[in-house]
């Protein structure tokens, strides 16, 4: 059996097990990860590279930074301030999505989610609303906000690099032509109808995320220092390019400072790390690597696009590229999906004599629609434990958002980015 066939079988297995959830998501990920090594598809180093991925380091760091915000009671304090202004659950959802969406446009969407997850859990605790109903809109807004600027998500820069090789480019805010209407439509959806689809779980955490602790004995300096370090970490992430320090390192410095200064103990810091998230993310990265290395991902893309024939309608091609990227991104990382599809889309556009910017915009926006699974993008994975989510929660809440993004994109793309200008 060829490596690509084995990879596709593992992909099918993962999808089935993620949907059924007969065994924990993290265990399924590890079965796939180890299975790819045992079958010889990947070597050990490649299969387990996901566990030293920069996003895993960012996860661990921000779990500790978030843990400190809880341990000191500062998350509850912030939650109290926000809930004074947002009186209803729907107002809270709108406020969270607007703040996260805008921040995600200039920050990494993963970084934005990592910083604000503990704050939102604090808001949930203070307001009495269930965190499972607030965290999912947060990560969806982070994904949508990534399409507001050139630096909002890695996939945006991948497409830009490909265009620069043929002396073309996207403007800094050009993605927002499609991205901003999608963000507005998404917020309106969850404010009116979509909030009914959000999961309604009672989640009780232990350790650093226990929001019902008595914080009266916590020194005030610890509360403020936890917030100051969070803000400094956030600023370091915003100015990542200027200071030359990667997101994960900024997070690591913040986490270390909190432990060294005694704001959070080593024991509580370790307790705040959600290992379920680490195993789920690290394990599924091996599947993404196998899809790329064996050519299985390219095979899927090639078969679908090849079925359209030699001279497909530009509108049909835009739709197919968008949907294909939207499907792939929910099982591979959104960055890997864009990296896989950009060269394929570019060659098709050039073969048709079409404007490559139109096809690549569809590719990037479709590749950002990682709403329907917990593994589509790192932020989705980060809230699995905190929100008590199951695989089908993402499908139920996120799939309508893919439909909305598709409809909005199919209206705007042919107008703003015509194939034959």
Spans of features found by a protein language model:
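Juxtamembrane and boundary regions of transmembrane helices in multi-pass small-molecule transporters
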Residues: 6, 91, 127-140, 146-158, ...
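Hydrophobic transmembrane alpha-helices of multi-pass small-molecule transporters
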Residues: 1-60, 64, 177-302, 318, ...
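Transmembrane alpha-helix interface/packing and boundary motifs in multi-pass membrane proteins
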Residues: 14-23, 99-108, 140-151, 236-242, ...
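Generic hydrophobic alpha-helical scaffold/packing signal
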Residues: 145, 232, 257-258, 267-270, ...
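Membrane-embedded alpha-helical segments and adjacent helix-loop junctions characteristic
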Residues: 13, 27, 32-34, 38-130, ...
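Glycine-centered helix-boundary capping/hinge motifs
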Residues: 21, 40, 73, 128, ...
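Alpha-helix N-cap/start motif
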Residues: 44, 90, 131, 172, ...
